[in-house]
């Protein structure tokens, strides 16, 4: 079973949203509230959090009917990883937090969709997903990461 994630930037809140794409959604993100990242809600993640899907390395909120938490990139320091050390993304995000002119929302969305998702698909490097999810998500991983190559972008 393929795991399809929709990557969207919300310029109004300056957050990156990763949401599962259901078969009925035709490529649109699953509707529902993303919730407040600063105050965890026990009801935000159902008891049956989808572990049966065998998507190792995803946080439990990835299986919530409301979709995963929005990832708030508020610090370039969080993004200084081997994943993007050679990219300009940390500098761009830092400039955005300072209110300076930087990469457009469209360009950032293209970066995540075309570069990161493509790498996950072709190389099966799940650690990339883990890094970005842990960058802003309050939920813990379902289980330890394992090699996989079934991620596709919407």
From Swiss-Prot:
Native organism: Hepatitis B virus genotype E subtype ayw4 (isolate Kou) (HBV-E)
Stated name of the protein: Protein X
Coiled coil: none
Alphabetical list of InterPro entries matching this protein: Transactivation_prot_X
A Pfam family annotated for this UniProt entry: X
Any one of the GO BP annotations: DNA-templated transcription
Quaternary structure note: May form homodimer. May interact with host CEBPA, CFLAR, CREB1, DDB1, E4F1, HBXIP, HSPD1/HSP60, NFKBIA, POLR2E and SMAD4. Interacts with host SMC5-SMC6 complex and induces its degradation. Interacts with host TRPC4AP; leading to prevent ubiquitination of TRPC4AP. Interacts with host PLSCR1; this interaction promotes ubiquitination and degradation of HBx and impairs HBx-mediated cell proliferation.
Signal sequence, renumbered to the chain: none
Family statement drawn from the similarity comment of this UniProt entry: Belongs to the orthohepadnavirus protein X family.
CC annotations in GO: host cell mitochondrion; host cell nucleus
PTM comment: A fraction may be phosphorylated in insect cells and HepG2 cells, a human hepatoblastoma cell line. Phosphorylated in vitro by host protein kinase C or mitogen-activated protein kinase. N-acetylated in insect cells.
Chain intervals for the UniProt region annotation (Mitochondrial targeting sequence): 68-117
Function: Multifunctional protein that plays a role in silencing host antiviral defenses and promoting viral transcription. Does not seem to be essential for HBV infection. May be directly involved in development of cirrhosis and liver cancer (hepatocellular carcinoma). Most of cytosolic activities involve modulation of cytosolic calcium. The effect on apoptosis is controversial depending on the cell types in which the studies have been conducted. May induce apoptosis by localizing in mitochondria and causing loss of mitochondrial membrane potential.
Keywords assigned: Activation of host NF-kappa-B by virus, Activator, Apoptosis, Host cytoplasm, Host G2/M cell cycle arrest by virus, Host mitochondrion, Host nucleus, Host-virus interaction, Modulation of host cell cycle by virus, Transcription, Transcription regulation
Domain of life, per lineage: Viruses
Protein's cellular compartments: Host cytoplasm; Host nucleus; Host mitochondrion
Main location per the UniProt record: host cell
């Amino acid at each position: 079973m393929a795991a399809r994630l929709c990557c969207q930037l919300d310029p109004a809140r300056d957050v990156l949203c990763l949401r599962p794409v259901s078969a009925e959604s035709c490529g649109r993100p699953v509707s529902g509230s993303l919730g407040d990242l600063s105050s965890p809600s026990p009801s935000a993640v159902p008891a049956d959090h989808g572990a049966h899907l065998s998507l190792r390395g995803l946080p439990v909120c990835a299986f919530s009917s409301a979709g995963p938490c929005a990832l708030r990139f508020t610090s370039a320091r969080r993004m200084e990883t081997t994943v993007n050390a050679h990219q300009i993304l940390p500098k761009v995000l830092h400039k955005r937090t300072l209110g300076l002119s930087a990469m457009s929302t469209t360009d950032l969305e293209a970066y995540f969709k075309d570069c990161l998702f493509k790498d996950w698909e072709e190389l099966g490097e799940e650690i990339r997903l883990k890094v970005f999810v842990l960058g802003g998500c309050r939920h813990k991983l379902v289980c330890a990461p394992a090699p996989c190559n079934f991620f596709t972008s919407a």
